[in-house]
Design a protein with these regions (language model features):
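N-terminal short beta-loop-beta anion/metal-coordinating cradle
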Residues: 1-90
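Gly/Ser/Thr-rich loops at beta-strand to alpha-helix junctions
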Residues: 23-29, 92-94, 122-127, 164-165, ...
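Catalytic cores of processing enzymes, dominated by hydrolases/peptidases
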Residues: 126-202
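Surface-exposed cleft-lining segments at the edges of enzyme active sites
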Residues: 90-95, 157-158
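Hydrophobic/aromatic beta-strand patches that form the interior of the parallel beta-sheet core
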Residues: 47, 84-86, 116-118, 135, ...
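Short, solvent-exposed amphipathic alpha-helical segments in soluble enzyme
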Residues: 35-39, 102-104, 200-202
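Internal, conserved structured core segments that host functional sites
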Residues: 93-143
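Alpha-helical scaffold segments in soluble metabolic enzymes
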Residues: 32, 36, 104, 170-174
């Protein structure tokens, strides 16, 4: 099996859960945002994803020790809503591995009757934006209208961006095949590989 999801803590009964994904990408906007939410809410780690399909490298942590890259799923109930957060150091690089990974995540999400998916990412610009705009695309019109209501979000993405690569895009497409409403929120950021899009993440 390419990807194995290990449960590391007990999961309470959940209903109509929402999955929020923020893995590394353009400007690391999604990762910065999700990691901040996890820390702020003190979300609890429930699952760890293991795979030999991850990049053949290690990361140096705050204690100056080497550790394998990881992807984890956290949980927190907020105002009677069950929220899951998908966070990690990396995402699968190869096309087939990315598909396999997303299918495994969706299998797990469906197992506890997940209702909706939100993916977070960036739109790379040629220079850092002063006031980053947030755009969205989704696999249904209904979820676009839901998130645009009372929020300053622009859904006119056609012709502005190319394909949405990686997990953030595939979860929308594969989610549609499973009738899971899914939306991607994309913030403007500087497109340089080493740039951290903190403004966009906010």
């Amino acid at each position: 099996m390419s990807f194995k999801i290990n449960q590391v803590n007990k999961l309470p009964a959940v209903k109509d859960a929402i999955l929020i994904e923020g893995l590394p990408g353009i400007g690391n906007v999604g990762k910065i945002a999700v990691d901040f939410i996890i820390e702020n809410l003190k979300a609890k780690k429930i699952f760890e994803v293991k795979s030999k399909k991850f990049p053949n490298s290690v990361f140096i942590n705050e204690k100056n020790l080497a550790e394998l890259p990881k992807i984890e799923i956290f949980y927190k109930k907020v105002k009677n809503r069950d929220l899951f957060f998908l966070s990690g150091d990396i995402q699968p690089i190869e096309d087939e591995s990315c598909y396999d990974f997303c299918e495994k995540i969706l299998d797990t999400f469906e197992s506890f009757k997940g209702k909706e998916i939100i993916t977070l990412g960036g739109i790379g610009l040629s220079k850092p934006p002063e006031s980053p705009k947030v755009f969205c695309t989704a696999n249904t019109q209904e979820i676009i209208q839901k998130y645009k209501e009372n929020n300053n979000i622009n859904s006119n993405l056609f012709g502005l961006v190319g394909p949405i690569m990686g997990v953030s895009g595939l979860l929308l497409g594969l989610g549609k095949e499973r009738n899971i409403p899914s939306i991607s929120l994309l913030a403007e950021t500087y497109g340089h590989p080493s740039y951290l899009g903190i403004k966009g993440a906010r």
